[in-house]
Amino acid sequence: MLEKEQIFVAKTFKEHFKGDDKSPLVLYGIGRNTEAILQCCSNLNIKGLMDQDSVGQFKIGKKVLSYEEIIELRPKIVIVARDSVVNIIYNRIAFLEEKGIKVYKIDGTKLCKDGLKYDNEELPYWSVSEKALEKAIDQHKVISFDIFDTLIMRRLIKHDRLSFEDEKKYLVKRDIMIEMLNYAMRQGKKIFLVSDMYYSSKELRELLEHCGIMEKYEIIVSCEHDVTKEDGGLFKILKLKVRKQLGQEAEESILHIGDNRIADGEMAESAGINTFLIMSSYELLMASSMQSILVKPGGLRWNQNVGYFISSFFNNPFALSGQNGYVKAGNLQELGYFFIAPLIYEYMLWLINQILQDDIEQMLFASRDGWLPYLIYEKMKQKNTNLPNAIYFKTSRRSVTVAAIRDRADINRLTKRKFSGSIKNFFQERFGILAKEDGIWENTETQTNKLLDQYERLILENAAIERASYLNYLRAKGINDKSKQGLFDFVAGGTVQYHLEKLIEQKVQGYYFATMNLPNDFYEEGCISAPFGNITSYGLDTKLSKHYLVMESILTDQDNTFVKIDTNNKLVFAEGENKKYQQMKKIHQGILRYVEDRLELDNVFTNEKNFEWDFSGPDGLFGYVFEEKNAISDQLKAEFENDDLYDGQQVYNSF
């Protein structure tokens, strides 16, 4: 027998596609509503189904078609899904429009890329709150709770059946819902836990206790009764137990709380039980302004990273109440924890994998943007003592290139790089000397040769002095000890690495987030390990590559740009004060807390050569910060600053 929703969906579909009895149709979806359409519209030319996880299988008597089969068939595609998730599915298959394939909603609305926008702002659920749930609990004598995705949840987006030990590993309680459970108990309500699950009540109790839920509530589970919530059988058992234990009056005052609108909603109501539906963390993500992250789901690491995010950010089913579905970080610590840390954390795991494969004996982290990765590395080293020792050292393009100058060829190479500013600033920033000339640095051949002829001797003399001091500093740090060394840099063209190699007369293996505009005078493309590849003006295909300057401003330490070591072995920095560091430190706190939390769960320190790294999930979380209605306010955006004194740029906002 069809439920109200199924009847409505089938009727709506039939009204708008009844004239398409000849045209091939494909339904995207394999759920109850699709089944209702197939049952009620057998006269239509429905050739098959679509579902990202079931390609090639037969569902509801129809084959789930591949993209190749769809392109050959050229049907109309109708998305059979709630309005709140239609955009996710459409974005997943929008490329098919290039093949002349049109995509529709069940009401006949043709979907198109230009017309898409986030349209869940008026979702009734955004007005639901824990206060409303408390009120509903107050009005009933008996409260039953669903277990999975209501009281406890897994830190995974999708999963097959897990082993019992893995189940424990990935489980986390939903704190607000445990508060609601305890609230009901304090109010003297009779409590039952009702679950469609393959675990016995004894096993479920063990999982609940693992999550800190120690009270011995009565559990009614499908595998012990051969009926389910889905078929209504468990609710009949619940009512029977309530009547026997508490009487008929209590039987008529049951509230069931759960997340599944069919099993916990419609089926409970059809049994005469009042309901209060909450959203699972996954449903919250699907309905929220972050839904686009689900358009291209990845593999295991995507699953784990995005799963951890939703189990944290959407742990509270009322997290978006009053926000119209828009996800926002309330402060800089939250910004660091939820949106920045996942990308850095995944990179650091990748880095460890690489240095273990490459048998690196000493890992170098260059200032300033090596500071936070260094702190994270040290935390990871506590977890894996086989990692090589790490050194954080002061360097910059200015300091290392000047110290590495030995002849006119070195000088000429450094003049090729673009500089915006005066002649005086050019010679100060590039070579560490004072020039007398006024005027703008034009970098013409005539101007360059004339000025270099004039200042070559002074440049070489200063370079020798700075080289001696800087080499003393590097020796004191233990950097030129002839170990097999790796070097972290964030996004770069290899300038620091190349000149450091010249100074210590030793090759160093570079590990970056991404390289920049390779090949260049220093390195060919591909010789530096970088999971985000080589960023060029035409290769901005990840969120990191588009917004790396913001990440760069986050990673840095408290000091201004390092200039040199003076003759008294003192570190010299660019003038001024790094006023924004205290704000960046708040982001650091959130990131480091995330790392500590993940290290409690993860065991992915591996030297496996073909480990399947997947940065798409963390990259998507990072990219959300830059959405139109984004995760942070304009006031917080103002805290992100960078400078590029080496190329003549003063402080600027990096957002």
Model segments located where?
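Active-site neighborhood of HAD-like aspartate-dependent phosphohydrolases
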Residues: 134-166
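Structural motif
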Residues: 28-32, 52-53, 79-84, 147, ...
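Hydrophobic, well-ordered beta-alpha structural blocks that scaffold small-molecule cofactor pockets
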Residues: 1-117, 463-466, 470, 500
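Long, low-complexity, Lys/Arg-enriched
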Residues: 239, 249, 254-257, 265-266, ...
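Short amphipathic alpha-helix with an adjacent loop that forms part of the alpha/beta core around
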Residues: 65-74, 130-136, 236-242
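Substrate-recognition "cap/lid" segment bordering the active-site pocket of phosphatases
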Residues: 56-61, 192-194, 198-252
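Short, acidic loop-to-helix structural element flanking the phosphoryl-transfer center
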Residues: 164-193
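Active-site regions of enzymes building and remodeling cell-envelope glycoconjugates
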Residues: 44-47, 59-70, 94-103, 163-165, ...
